[in-house]
């Protein structure tokens, strides 16, 4: 028999359960420390900024939107995420297959050095059919 087999031993379950509870308590304590440190950091560094004070005081953002000089430089928020068909996208069009001249050459150790032109042509044909490239 191999050494990798495991059997259900009823006594071990209790030990594992205690370890799991101890781990969970440690995890909870660490999370509480993390959340406490975040609140301390806010009160020290970020609390001095005007924006942070405005958020804490519950100041309404209508004052910013009513300022015409400030909002005139920005387009309306609904125009930011709309699909603009008149712009040219410089990326690849995935519906079109790449041209054979753009495809990378295989490394030299993959290809035999003494290939006849017929064998090279056959390999390129097979690669093109695998990649579904129309030559």
Curated annotation (Swiss-Prot):
Belongs to the PNRC family. PNRC2 subfamily. The gene is pnrc2-b. The lineage of its organism: Eukaryota, Metazoa, Chordata, Craniata, Vertebrata. Residues 75-89 have a biased composition (Polar residues). A motif (SH3-binding) lies at residues 95-101. This is Proline-rich nuclear receptor coactivator 2 B. It holds the Pfam family PNRC. One of its GO terms (biological process) is nuclear-transcribed mRNA catabolic process, nonsense-mediated decay. Its main location: nucleus. Coiled coil: none annotated. Keywords: Activator, Cytoplasm, Nonsense-mediated mRNA decay, Nucleus, Transcription, Transcription regulation. InterPro entries: PNRC-like_rgn, PNRC1/2. Involved in nonsense-mediated mRNA decay (NMD) by acting as a bridge between the mRNA decapping complex and the NMD machinery. May act by targeting the NMD machinery to the P-body and recruiting the decapping machinery to aberrant mRNAs. Required for upf1/rent1 localization to the P-body. Also acts as a nuclear receptor coactivator. GO terms for cellular component: nucleus; P-body. It is found in: Nucleus; Cytoplasm, P-body. Residues 75-103 are annotated as: Disordered.
């Amino acid at each position: 028999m191999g050494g990798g087999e495991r059997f259900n031993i009823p006594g071990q379950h209790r030990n594992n359960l205690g370890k799991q509870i101890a781990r969970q308590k440690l995890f909870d304590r660490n999370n509480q420390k993390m959340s406490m440190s975040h609140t301390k950091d806010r009160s020290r560094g970020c609390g001095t900024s005007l924006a942070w004070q405005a958020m804490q005081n519950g100041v309404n953002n209508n004052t910013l939107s009513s300022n015409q000089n400030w909002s005139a430089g920005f387009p309306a928020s609904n125009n930011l995420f709309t699909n603009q068909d008149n712009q040219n996208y410089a990326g690849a069009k995935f519906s079109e297959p790449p041209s054979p001249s753009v495809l990378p050459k295989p490394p030299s150790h993959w290809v035999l050095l003494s290939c006849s032109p017929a064998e090279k042509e056959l390999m390129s044909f097979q690669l093109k059919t695998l990649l579904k490239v129309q030559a």
